[in-house]
Amino acid sequence: MKKLLLLFTLVFLSCSEVEDVESIIIDNNSKWVEYYNKGDAKGIASLHTLDAVVIPPKSDFVVGRDKIEEMYKAEIEMGNGMLGLQTTEVIQEGLYAYETGLYDIKMTIEGEEVNDYGKYIVVWEKQKNGDWLCKKDIWNTSLVYSN
């Protein structure tokens, strides 16, 4: 009976340590949206690993937290924006979580309203301190580009 009680206790304790990674990522996305909508490029960059890679549509790779901050700063300065993110799936494998989702953004650029929406994939990496940060980010856009 004591062994059964010990086994039950161990199973219960191990279950209570399971992280709800999807909730953590959704919370991170809420911060991301908040930072973006108030124009805080440094805040957005802080949600990325130091060596993160961002792959925007029709652009080169943006590598490193500092460059990512510069990219978002330039985008934010381009026009007043309101971003929305919707996580559709999170799959965790060890120290990595793979998120797919949808985004929408409304911006006013030079007095003209621009609406964009698309899909994204983010790879999140668990840090030594327990935080989950964006390691890789790629998205597509509904906007048509002209050359």
Task: Locate each region found by the language model.
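Generic hydrophobic alpha-helical segments
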Residues: 31-32
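Short beta-strand edge/turn micro-motifs at domain boundaries
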Residues: 117-143
